[in-house]
Every structure is written in structure tokens, then in C-alpha cells.
Amino acid sequence: MADLDASTPRVFIARHGETEWTKNGRYTGSTELELTADGVKQVEGTASHLVGSGKLIDPARVVQIFVSPRKRAQQTFNLLFKDSDISLDSDRVKLEEEITEWDHGMYEGWLGSEIRASRKERGLDKDGDWSIWADGCEDGESPEQVTERLDRLIAKIRDIQRPHMNGEKPADVVVVAHGMSLRCFVKRWLGYPLDMPLALMLSPGAIGILSYLKHDIKQPAFFVGMSLPPL
């Protein structure tokens, strides 16, 4: 069923399901990995409860879906919308490089502990531990580069939703991507720098919700909780 605030456009962020590297805690950027069996079940469970006619994500209310080109994100999209008329070749779906995972450079496939140990051995981070939010990745992306591309995507989304802030017509957007890039996306949606100490959790296969306060495009907001109409 749709929620009580459905007249204001929303942005649903969907993290891909579990992969082998998700299980192991390895930094995964450009490496192409498929979902594990459990990862498939995670997304199928989310889809059965939250995606469909009259549900939280109602395909009839979705005007645009941005999907990371990585295989695990495309697989997640297919599972989320398998019972709808939306497919990857739909006009409403775009494979979007702007929402790909943070380019981890030389840290690709490493554990956080391995990254920190390597940097310490090479005389880096003398004043504290490495943080991807502030320091970025060697031979990969800096926080500034990630910020720039996410801001471009957010601008596209707001251009789509701006004419429909009072529910003139449905204008929900879905973004299917990765744990790190989506948490960065939330921070930038709210106007925060990536290194702001805002702890965010987004489980594999989970859905998060962003919108606007008081139907105002200038007041982007994060749904901490949502009320639902009676059955």
C-alpha cells in the first residue's frame, strides 16, 4: 500500500544484495560479482513486501530508475521489478555511471584492516587512521570526485521532480546501487560533505527513502520513519 506522504515525490535507494565480498567485508568497486544465493533471497524478500501495485514502491508511480552498470546492481534491479512491466530496456530505466560504487583504486578487494596496515607501513596517516570519507582511495577516487558526480545525478533527479512537488502527477525515482555510493548519495542529498560524521546503515537488499519537507524542492529530507494507511 502507498504511504500517507506519497503525494510528495520520493527517491527510493536500493542497495544490491549480498555478494561474496560483501560477506567478507572486502571493498568492492569495479569488480564484477554476482549475488550469492542469500543475496538473491534478500532482494526477493524486499520485492515481495515493498514493490508492486499499491505497495511502497509502486511501479505506476515511478517515472525514472537509475541503475549502476555493475552486474550486481543490474541483477538486483531485475529481481526488484521482475513482477512489473519495467525492464532494463524500458524508457524509464537508465544505466547510470554517476551512481557506480566508489572507485577504490589499489584498495579494490582489500579489507579495511589491510588498507590501514598498508598505509601505516608506508608512513601515511601519522595523525590518525585512514578514512575513506576524508582521504579517498589511492589510484582511485577522492571524496571530491565522488561528490561531483553524485551532485550531477541529484541535479538530474530534482529537475525531474521539481514540477510535481504537490503531487501534480507521480514522480517517484528509484536508484539501485551500492552500499558506499548510496550512503554518499544520502549525505549529498541533504547537503552534507562526505566526511561529516553521520553514521548510516544500509543492509544488502535494503531500501531507503528520501524526499522533501513541506513539498519544497529546497528542503531535501531523509525519512527516519513513515506512517502507513490502515489495511
Stretches with model-predicted labels:
Residues 2-88:
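Active-site-proximal alpha-helix that buttresses catalytic centers in soluble enzyme cores
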Residues 42-46, 73-76, 142, 146-157:
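Alpha-helical packing segments of well-folded alpha/beta enzyme cores
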Residues 34, 85-96, 194-202:
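Short hydrophobic/aromatic-enriched beta-strand-loop microsegments
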Residues 17, 179-180, 228-229:
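Active-site metal-binding loops of divalent metal-dependent hydrolases
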Residues 1-10, 46, 56, 82, ...:
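Acidic, low-complexity terminal tails and accessory targeting/binding regions
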Residues 4, 57-97, 120-125, 211-231:
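Conserved histidine-centered catalytic loops in small-molecule metabolism enzymes
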Residues 82-152:
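Phosphate-handling substructures
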Residues 58-69, 164-176:
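Short glycine-rich phosphate-binding loop at a beta-alpha junction
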